[in-house]
């Protein structure tokens, strides 16, 4: 793995800094309800146990909310929870994020008090209201707790009680959290609030403007010209929707359905990123961009209106038409990434992808023809039902896609299928 020490805020060898979007949304919702809190970005700062304790002592928390996006966060969550409980025995410890698919493990193996399951904005606010009236974590009022949708905890019989999934905010009411609170936390707990600017990658680096691995196909005169225009600019990220229209059996989803952000909120965020953080390119971090065609078109119009180039980091081949791609290209789209997963229709059907190898080939062929950058590197091997025959079908298909795009046909970077807790797989 490439060392990223130059990008490490702590001076240690860690990945590029990332946006703690989920927990910022939850805190923003709590603040609208009259509560206050701090963002301590342990993930990016990568602090030692001693540093974590020193920073906790600055706040002396009554409640600590921890976000675990996926199951790989468990070892660090366990470590941090131990520090909190040993030093703040009266503090409530609440865990949320996709790792809530392993609520039983968190509750049995750590000192977690409550797990928020599913969307957290409403459930966490209701939990705060409960704790305000019942501050003692050791004397829970179970008749009241069970009224809150989206919680998992030990009940009066020491059995795990789950109250369903958290109530969702309507799509048009979803807002983008301010980075100001995050910046304050970086200043208070790290080595300076200006660290926030490191999250925005440099557009001077050609690969950053796509969010894809660089390939021969990307070095076109048009894209090189656009890259020269973006020198000195930053690359940011934005979501235009939450959720997906499909139910692939390998995918961990803690939110039901598919919701899109209101256009007024989206435009305000684009303007903020451009004017405050010098962003010239946005990577659209949707699981499933474009399934709501009207919203996808409006997003593209807003990007062009404000002079922003953009790339879609996740889309379904079945959801995007040729006309859609042409429209997006005309409105500043640079690249799009499709979930391909397999070159075997047998495996795609087992995954319940609801798409075909022909759908993907047609999309990549259109991208090549009209000049939208894309990638063929989104394959998964080792799925239940995988055989020598299906693996060879995937290898052949990948070679066909790479040849189609003008890349080296004999290289590939597949991932292993992973059975993440909370998924059918």
List each model region and its residues.
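Short aromatic-enriched loop/helix-cap "lid" or pocket-rim segments at secondary-structure transitions
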Residues: 164-166, 174-175, 296, 324-325, ...
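Structural recognition of alpha->loop->beta junctions
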Residues: 106-126, 330-336, 397-414
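Flexible glycine/acidic-rich beta-alpha junction loops that bind and position SAM and/or redox cofactors
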Residues: 5-8, 102-105, 156, 246, ...
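Short helix-capping segments at alpha-helix termini
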Residues: 85-90, 303-308, 370-371, 403-407
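Acidic, low-complexity intrinsically disordered segments
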Residues: 1-269, 274-278
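Catalytic cores of alpha/beta
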Residues: 104-110, 324, 385-400
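Radical SAM [4Fe-4S] cluster-binding motif and immediate context
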Residues: 18, 181-376, 381-383, 396
């Amino acid at each position: 793995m490439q060392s990223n020490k130059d990008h490490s805020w702590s001076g240690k060898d860690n990945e590029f800094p990332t946006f703690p979007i989920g927990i910022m949304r939850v805190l923003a919702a709590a603040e609208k309800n009259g509560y206050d809190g701090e963002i301590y970005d342990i993930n990016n700062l990568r602090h030692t146990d001693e540093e974590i304790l020193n920073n906790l002592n600055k706040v002396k928390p009554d409640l600590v909310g921890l976000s675990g996006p996926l199951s790989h966060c468990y070892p660090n969550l366990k470590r941090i929870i131990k520090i909190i409980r040993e030093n703040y025995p009266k503090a409530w410890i609440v865990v949320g994020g996709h790792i809530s698919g392993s609520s039983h493990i968190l509750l049995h193996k750590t000192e977690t008090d409550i797990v928020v399951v599913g969307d957290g904005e409403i459930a966490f606010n209701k939990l705060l209201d409960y704790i305000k009236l019942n501050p003692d974590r050791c004397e829970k009022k179970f008749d009241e707790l069970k009224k809150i949708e989206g919680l998992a905890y030990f009940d009066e019989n020491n059995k795990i009680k789950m109250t369903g999934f958290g109530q969702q905010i309507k799509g048009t009411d979803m807002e983008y959290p301010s980075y100001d609170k995050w910046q304050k936390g970086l200043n208070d707990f790290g080595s300076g609030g200006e660290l926030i600017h490191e999250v925005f990658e440099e557009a001077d680096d050609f690969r950053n403007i796509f969010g894809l691995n660089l390939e021969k196909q990307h070095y076109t005169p048009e894209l090189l010209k656009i890259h020269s225009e973006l020198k000195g600019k930053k690359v940011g990220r934005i979501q235009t929707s939450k959720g997906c229209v499909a139910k692939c059996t390998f995918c961990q989803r803690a939110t039901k359905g598919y919701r899109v952000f209101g256009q007024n909120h989206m435009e305000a965020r684009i303007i903020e990123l451009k004017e405050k953080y010098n962003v010239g390119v946005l990577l659209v971090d949707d699981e499933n961009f474009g399934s709501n065609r009207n919203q996808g078109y409006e997003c593209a119009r807003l990007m062009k209106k404000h002079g922003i180039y953009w790339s879609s980091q996740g889309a379904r081949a079945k959801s995007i038409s040729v006309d859609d791609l042409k429209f997006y290209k005309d409105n500043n789209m640079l690249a799009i990434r499709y979930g391909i997963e397999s070159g075997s229709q047998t495996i795609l059907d087992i995954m319940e992808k609801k798409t075909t190898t022909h759908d993907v080939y047609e999309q990549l062929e259109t991208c090549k023809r009209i000049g939208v950058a894309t990638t063929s590197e989104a394959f998964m091997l080792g799925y239940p039902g995988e055989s020598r025959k299906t693996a060879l079908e995937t290898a052949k298909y990948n070679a066909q896609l790479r040849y189609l795009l003008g890349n080296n046909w004999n290289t590939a970077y597949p991932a292993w299928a992973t059975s993440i807790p909370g998924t059918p797989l």
